[in-house]
Amino acid sequence: MDKRKQSDYDNGKSKPTNGSKTTKFNLIKIIIRNLLIGILLMLVLNTIRFTSKQPKVEILSPDHIDSFTTLSDIELAQRLAKATTFKTISFGESDEFDQYEPEFLKFHEFLKITFPKVHKYLKLNIIANYSLVYNWKGLDESLKPILLAGHIDVVPTLFLDKWTHPPFSGHIDDTYIWGRGTMDDKGSVMAILESVEDLLSQGFKPQRSIYFAFGHDEELGGNNGAFNINKYFDTNEIGPFEFILDEGLPILLPPVFPGLSKPIASVGITEKGAIDIKLSVTIVGGHSSMPRRESAIGVLAQAVSKLENNPPSPKLRETRLLFDFVGRECSLPYRFLFSNLWLFEPIISRVLSTKPTLDALQRTTTALTIFNAGNKANVIPMEANATINFRVVPGDSTNDIIDHVNRVINDDRVKISKISNIIEPAPVSSTTSKSFNLLQSTILQEFPDVVVAPTIMIANTDTRHYWNLTENIFRFCPMVLENSDLQRLHGIDERLTIKNYKQLVDFYYHLIKNTEKYL
């Protein structure tokens, strides 16, 4: 042994023992244990504090709800059914539109006949020949007006032989109103006008002015209708608006959200952007008997596969608000998770990724929609083209997506040949405003068993043209649907229940009246 060390020990300094090592180890264990206990207590405390964000409202009795209208449910349904018989189909090509132009004009006349008080007491402006803007002047011009929006055009109908009832027949049975436009969006337009007609019959006069804007080409992007409606407001110095409510998300019956047994009324406080990117590959072709090692189709297929397998990273910014509202109403295990997103968010995001409908709420989606190459079985084409539609989540920009495409493909043979239909994600409306409280409270009055929650609108609406008119834009329609009904939108057998259509009328009626109370 080193003499110096031996001397130290001889002078009374003790050697390290296993006991001291054990003491240090036990101290570390105590620290870790206390830390874990502290984290657990914080998780539990967060769960306890995670209470409902649904306001307490006066639930309307059935007698009170029904007292405002003299029309029966079936009479209301018949008027909507008649509205669906007009083939107000939106087409981009002028020669195609010409054959449907009379249908729009006939629909205008139908509205004048069906809602005489609306057309007597409200000022109507026809915009771009077919879009409609009504002005219901308020008693106090110092108050900001509100805008209720919708659209009167519908998408074309395909596979007519698969429809239970012809899409423009105006068919009604004991339960449903069948036809193109019942859900998107003549149901909302007619319900709004029914509610106004009833309010006028009672002599109701709003404190603030109310505008109603119904575009004629929403299904094509609103570039003629809503775009010119915005110009009309700007030219006439109308606005800013207190809020805008347009078509949007429905009330979905469970199961929709994990751990939640109630229906969800989702209010779109923003909406995704969009961009179409066309990819092209040009490589020498030739006869199929002498193929080269690479082909335009093969190279492009690999590029598209890379994009599908490497989507943009998730962005849970606005989706956190959905979790914040809905998570508070979930059963305990899920409430524990959603009240502690700081810890469990990566796990929740991974779960969302397994379901396309939920994954669309957290990331920019990638959809290959067009692929063109070749026209003969024994000829290798020298060119292949593909168009990918991206729906851009708030937090990403369209430029981010262009960079993403180039980075993921990383192949000089693949060129971006065209970029089109660029829409940036919409601004986000506040959930703490009086306007949101008005909307949430009115929904709960009419549908007391639902959970109202803000979310991202994954499709685009006419509101893309209205961003400059207000900070408060909401996208919601009180249709009550099951998940299986969503395919009827733009699909086969579009329909709405007679009972639910009456609820639409009730909802807009009380929304207008509640502006006096909540704003």
UniProtKB/Swiss-Prot annotation:
It comes from Dictyostelium discoideum. It comes from the Eukaryota. This is Probable carboxypeptidase S-like 2. GO terms for molecular function: metal ion binding; peptidase activity. Disulfide bonds: none annotated. The active site is at residues 153, 218. GO terms for cellular component: membrane. It is found in: Membrane. The keyword Membrane applies.
